[in-house]
């Protein structure tokens, strides 16, 4: 099953996250199928490719609870 989830990157104490599509059984920092945007909680900066997210959601990709909350703030 594919999931829409956050992949951590950045420095210690200054984490940033990429919004990616990946299998639910993969590790957090594993290989992603597609990158759809990023989220930086330190600067509250967010960039999401809304069209690709809607396409992936229509294909049956399930977002994690954190991603769902993020999408509710940004998109809907």
UniProtKB/Swiss-Prot annotation:
**What are the alphabetically sorted keywords of the record?**
Chloroplast, Plastid, Ribonucleoprotein, Ribosomal protein
Which Gene3D superfamilies does the UniProt entry name for this protein?
3.30.1320.10
Q: What InterPro entries does the record point to?
A: Ribosomal_bS16, Ribosomal_bS16_dom_sf
The record's subcellular location field reads: Plastid, Chloroplast
**Gene Ontology molecular function terms on file:** structural constituent of ribosome
Q: Which Pfam families match?
A: Ribosomal_S16
User: Can you tell which superkingdom this protein's organism belongs to?
Assistant: Eukaryota
Does the UniProt entry include the keyword Ribonucleoprotein?
A: yes
Q: Please report which protein family the annotation says this sequence is part of.
A: Belongs to the bacterial ribosomal protein bS16 family.
NCBIfam families for the chain: S16 (TIGR00002)
What's the protein name? Answer: Small ribosomal subunit protein bS16c
Gene for this protein? rps16
